[in-house]
């Protein structure tokens, strides 16, 4: 299994509940590669100092959230040069219109206007290289990444067709791993939008490193409605559904139990319950994070070991592809 998070902005509850917690739950079942995808982070304008600091923060949060180095290889994408090299090879056989049709590119290109970089168009090919280098069987994806995984499969199939027709395939076609729960945590300021690091409002998300006071402030100010009594699945009350679902996932209670508990509540009663659940979830993560960051050499050594382990696998795949393309090897 392979997955990763960009070191841009702060990791938030959506990243944890929608992705990282699921990685932790399944890590003993798979051979895992968890990457800090810093090459993806520079496809939009970025601050170099923040990128460097956030790279270590994300790696430390992987560990603090429960990723076990005994069950996973943790590494930084740019530390393994095969990612960039395979991306170029895949670029040369990927039709341009495949990339122009990607929904995320269209959305982000509109925001950037004339300043849109070629790297943003090429983002899905880099993602394909990330996945294909490790012969990944499963890739955890949310709804917003399904199209990128489909493109990865198309690119792998094209390589196999062009260079290994009637022969064993060169690249493995990965399958999506869609989480059963917690897959979509919504914004605190708009229950119809996904919680996002890129949202300009800090009030829209709860970051994994937010203090208890910051958490209380954000939940106190989060968008609600004037209706007393809280219920799931009312299309006219997206915020109620979002906050109840968040409470359910954090407490581990059943949907039916939460519905019964909160049926007659007002927001003034419910928000302290949600606040306590968030703080209780994040407290051990923050404690472990602080311990890791207090020992920088441990984190750097772990990432160096991860780079070596990842490069061994990635370079073997890259060599296989280069030979298929007709390159000579040194």
Curated annotation (Swiss-Prot):
Gene Ontology MF term list: ATP binding; tryptophan-tRNA ligase activity
Which residues, by range, are in coiled-coil regions? none
Annotated compartments: Cytoplasm
- InterPro entries, alphabetically? aa-tRNA-synth_I_CS (IPR001412), aa-tRNA-synth_Ic (IPR002305), Rossmann-like_a/b/a_fold (IPR014729), Trp-tRNA-ligase (IPR002306), Trp-tRNA-ligase_bac-type (IPR024109), Trp-tRNA_synthetase (IPR050203)
What's the chief localization of this chain? cytoplasm
Q: Main role?
A: Catalyzes the attachment of tryptophan to tRNA(Trp).
| Name of the protein | Tryptophan--tRNA ligase
